[in-house]
Amino acid sequence: MILTDRQPHRVEVTVLGEFELADFKQFETLFDEVLAGDAPVDLYFDLRGMAGFTVDVAWEEVVFSRQHGKDFRRIAVIAEHRWEAWAVWLTKLSAQAELRVFADEEGARSWLAGAL
């Protein structure tokens, strides 16, 4: 399950439990709506509540990153586990955005706002 929020130039996603393909499709739809307004888009991605992800999500993320790598400005990821940070690093290979991993929400939001 995911919780989402959209703002001008920003998509926010919080993952709770297992990240499944239907969740990723929901994120893609929201991203496309925000992108239609103006690019590039910032992404706030909170993975602290994620229990895992399905293989089809991993593949969809690779396809999405290659398709939209240039459409991001900054990607802030909140992660508690080393494997989550590693997965974020893989995303960086195909995204042209600035990407940082944070341990807390405040740091991530400040960075997206340009304060750090």
Tell me the role of every PLM-derived stretch:
Residues 1-116:
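Amphipathic, Lys/Arg-enriched alpha-helical "gate/interface" segment within cytosolic domains
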